[in-house]
């Protein structure tokens, strides 16, 4: 039997296995193998194995945030439990198999919610007290942190420019819950495994001076966030500033002014947040 599946709207690009679970549930409902009257109240996100087991997908925290904002419940894979649990709101459910999801939708089984113990706590950051001397440099960091300014450190090699820059996050105000969710949502798109470890930590990104323009601002057929977006609500540290390509540095002008980056590619146009403090270091 041939089955045609239509994913609308057709002009939006669709990639990855995140649609496996909703497609499977839709097929079961359309063929009357699943009797559930409240499917419209749920968002379903997850990749299916051949056995019907649910697998985690990137960006689950973004999906959960938007679903809750729209007043709907969301069901994700157990692998995404720690990530979604950071939202700490009602309306999130986790499951490990398609059969479990179907039983829940039919009212025959209860699904677990992400546990509070999945919530991570901030870890200690580098302490400015570790820096001996450099009174002018430390004073500059304090002014930078207080005013949200950008900073250029100039000095000979070995004078502690990198050490000073890495300690700025330790004197910045803690992330609010909204800021922490924004940063976690961006990070989950590229490295979901570290979301819980870095929860409520100010991002600190230090790309090498050989980093390409795409690595810095983001890109790809369906644009992924780059270093400037991964530094959102945190710090972007550019060591050896003159060694970066001219066009890479020019690309930072718009994000510094607007706090976001617009990426236009053939298959998608995406805007990522990119509100960061720029700390640069160079030799005289």
Where in this protein do the model-derived segments appear?
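Short loop/turn elements that form and flank the Walker-type P-loop nucleotide-binding site
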Residues: 38-39, 69-70, 88-89, 146-148, ...
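AAA+/SF3 P-loop NTPase mechanochemical coupling elements
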Residues: 204-205, 223-233, 263-283
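Walker B catalytic acidic pair
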Residues: 233, 239-241, 251
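Peripheral, non-AAA+ core regions of ATP-driven protein-machinery
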Residues: 1-152, 156-163, 264
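Helical "lid/switch" subdomain of P-loop NTPase nucleotide-binding domains
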Residues: 164, 168, 224-227, 240, ...
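Walker A/P-loop
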Residues: 153-196, 253, 258
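Conserved catalytic/switch belt of AAA+ P-loop NTPases
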Residues: 249-270
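P-loop NTPase nucleotide-binding/switch module
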Residues: 109-143, 147, 174-229
